[in-house]
Amino acid sequence: MRHRKAYRKLSKPTPQRKALFKALLISLFKHGKIVTTLPRAKEVTRIAEKLLTIAKEDSVHHRRLVYAWLQDRELVRKVFVEIAPKYKDRNGGYIRILKLGMRRGDAAEQAVIEFV
C-alpha cells in the first residue's frame, strides 16, 4: 500500500511539476548548487538523493534510470564518474539545504541546495 507516501504538489499539474524537478536536478548536477524556494528544495533533494544512491553502483540499468531524469548523456557521465564516487562510503545525506531567508518580492522562503 502507498499510505503516507505523500509529496508536495507545489500547486502545479503533474507534467509541469515533473518538468520543474527535471530542470532543477539538471542545474544542481551541472553547477553543484542552486538557489530556489524551500519547498522546491526539499522535493528536489528527495529525488537527487535517490539518483545518487542509484549512481553509486555503475551499470547500464542504473545509467538509464538516471538518464530518465537528467536527459543528458554528458551529465549522466559526470554523475557516475565524478559525483557518485565521492559518496561511495556514505549512506545518504549527500545534499545540504541552507535557508537564506525571505525573497524580497513575494516573501517566499529561499534556500540553497548543495552537495556535502
From Swiss-Prot:
In its UniProt entry, the species of origin is given as: Dictyoglomus turgidum (strain DSM 6724 / Z-1310)
One term under GO cellular component: cytosolic large ribosomal subunit
- Protein's name according to its UniProt entry: Large ribosomal subunit protein bL17
Q: Give the protein family.
A: Belongs to the bacterial ribosomal protein bL17 family.
Q: Does the keyword Oxidoreductase apply?
A: no
SUPFAM superfamilies reported in the protein's UniProt record: Prokaryotic ribosomal protein L17
Q: Which Pfam families match?
A: Ribosomal_L17
The record's listing under PANTHER family reads:
LARGE RIBOSOMAL SUBUNIT PROTEIN BL17M, RIBOSOMAL PROTEIN L17
Under the GO molecular function aspect, what terms does this record hold? Answer: structural constituent of ribosome
Record text on subunit structure and interactions: Part of the 50S ribosomal subunit. Contacts protein L32.
Q: Which cysteines are joined by disulfide bonds?
A: none
> Which terms are listed as keywords in the entry?
Ribonucleoprotein, Ribosomal protein
Highest taxon, organism lineage? Bacteria
Which InterPro entries does the protein's record reference?
Ribosomal_bL17 (IPR000456), Ribosomal_bL17_CS (IPR047859), Ribosomal_bL17_sf (IPR036373)
